[in-house]
From Swiss-Prot:
One of its GO terms (molecular function) is ATP binding. It catalyses: 1-(5-phospho-beta-D-ribosyl)-ATP + H2O = 1-(5-phospho-beta-D-ribosyl)-5'-AMP + diphosphate + H(+). CDD domains: NTP-PPase_HisIE_like. This is Phosphoribosyl-ATP pyrophosphatase. SUPFAM superfamilies: all-alpha NTP pyrophosphatases (SSF101386). Pfam families: PRA-PH (PF01503). Belongs to the PRA-PH family. GO terms for cellular component: cytoplasm. Its EC number is 3.6.1.31. Pathway: Amino-acid biosynthesis; L-histidine biosynthesis; L-histidine from 5-phospho-alpha-D-ribose 1-diphosphate: step 2/9. Its main location: cytoplasm. It comes from Novosphingobium aromaticivorans (strain ATCC 700278 / DSM 12444 / CCUG 56034 / CIP 105152 / NBRC 16084 / F199).
Length: 107
């Protein structure tokens, strides 16, 4: 199975459930609570990912990274930003030094 297919299916599932019944869907429940709650979850998952990495627990790191990506995709969906736009930005940056890319943004 292609990894991109997994992300595309996840994005479609999130979009489908976004406006669903909050009692039946975690995605709908998060969206019903608003953007601030979704953003809070992204922050929490980011912190948990960092903690797992520093603890050296590979299995926990993989699980937390998956949670982080999921919640980031929920946030992007809530803001009507297709994941393809993020991938396009990564493609645009490919082959560019991180230092040079950052300098180009500060001008």
């Amino acid at each position: 199975m292609e990894h991109g297919e997994i992300l595309a299916r996840l994005e479609a599932t999130i979009a489908e459930r976004r406006l669903g019944d909050p009692s039946a869907s975690y995605v709908a429940k998060l969206n019903a609570k608003g953007l601030a709650k979704i953003a809070q979850k992204v922050g929490e998952e980011g912190t948990e990912t960092v903690i797992a990495a520093l603890a050296g627990d590979r299995k926990e790191l993989v699980g937390e990274a998956a949670d982080l990506i999921f919640h980031l995709m929920v946030l992007l969906s809530a803001k009507d930003v297709p994941f393809a736009e993020v991938l396009a930005e990564l493609a645009r940056r490919e082959g560019t030094s991180g230092i040079a890319e950052k300098a180009s943004r500060s001008n």
